[in-house]
Amino acid sequence: MPDVTLTTLQGLKQSGEKIAMLTCYDATFAHTASQAGVDVLLVGDSLGMVLQGHDSTLPVSNEEMAYHTACVKRGNKGSLIVTDLAFESSHSVAQTLADAVRLMQAGAHMVKLEGGVWLAEPIARLAQMGVPVCAHLGLTPQAVNLFGGFKVQGRQETQARQLRADAIALEQAGAAMLLLECVPSVLAEEITQAVKIPVIGIGAGAATDGQVLVMHDMLGLSLTGRSPKFVKDFMQGQESIPAAIAAYVRAVKDVSFPAAEHGFNA
């Protein structure tokens, strides 16, 4: 199979084939996931919680993100690599640009930024530099303290209207992809139809252009013993991790995942 590129993802959106995305933090899992057909590997700052044991993503440094990106790059066999910019990267546009360059040098094909319309300037600057950006809207974990916890976003009409406007504005600024987290399924469908760029969902229903889960969640691994509503344990009924990942890819592609039970109402 040829390497997955941004052009590949754009083609999948146009054809209606769903995009399978999964978090990944090391070479072995990168090799396993890419061989199983995962289109996009997300080196997420979720590593702060599932690998480091923190209660949020805030303590993760950009240097740690670069380290794990390099690990994933060495094991990857053709998937597109997207890496989160750490929380510390957001205090100035100059810092965001410098840290994005560091992640691209480490092996990322795209960087991900959490936030709203205020990201238009750094996204535009990065696009001018040739750095593809995935904008992350809805429940943005780096803003967990502002939200008062990990809560569904966009249920109130004012919130929903702002999310729609943010999505369009960030596409116009140059965002190449969009991730929607924990928003009502109907709103996610509206946003997916309103923009031309690929839209990936997590807890956002089945109408987005693709799905992403945290690797540990979909393998049934948890420090707390509890999983978010939008998670399905794909290890159930499978004899190996590669088989579970392949089952996840199939379920995303044939739209059997997510089911209605994994989404949120307005």
From Swiss-Prot:
EC id: 2.1.2.11
Q: CDD domains per the record?
A: KPHMT-like
Q: Which top EC class is given? A: transferase
| Compartment annotation | Cytoplasm
List the active-site residues. Answer: 181
Reactions listed under catalytic activity: 3-methyl-2-oxobutanoate + (6R)-5,10-methylene-5,6,7,8-tetrahydrofolate + H2O = 2-dehydropantoate + (6S)-5,6,7,8-tetrahydrofolate
Q: Where does 3-methyl-2-oxobutanoate bind?
A: 45-46, 84, 112
List the protein's name. Answer: 3-methyl-2-oxobutanoate hydroxymethyltransferase 2
Q: Which GO terms describe its molecular function?
A: 3-methyl-2-oxobutanoate hydroxymethyltransferase activity; magnesium ion binding
User: Which residues does the annotation say bind Mg(2+)?
Assistant: 45, 84, 114
Chain's gene name: panB2
Q: Name one GO biological process term.
A: pantothenate biosynthetic process
Q: Which family does it belong to?
A: Belongs to the PanB family.
- Summarize the subunit comment: Homodecamer; pentamer of dimers.
Q: Give the protein's function.
A: Catalyzes the reversible reaction in which hydroxymethyl group from 5,10-methylenetetrahydrofolate is transferred onto alpha-ketoisovalerate to form ketopantoate.
Which HAMAP family does the record match to this protein?
PanB
Q: What lineage does UniProt assign to this protein's organism?
A: Bacteria, Pseudomonadati, Pseudomonadota, Gammaproteobacteria, Pseudomonadales
Q: Keywords, A to Z? A: Cytoplasm, Magnesium, Metal-binding, Pantothenate biosynthesis, Transferase
- Cofactor(s), by name: Mg(2+)
Name any GO cellular component annotation.
Answer: cytoplasm
The record's cofactor note says: Binds 1 Mg(2+) ion per subunit.
Please tell me where this protein is predominantly located.
cytoplasm
Pathways per UniProt: Cofactor biosynthesis; (R)-pantothenate biosynthesis; (R)-pantoate from 3-methyl-2-oxobutanoate: step 1/2
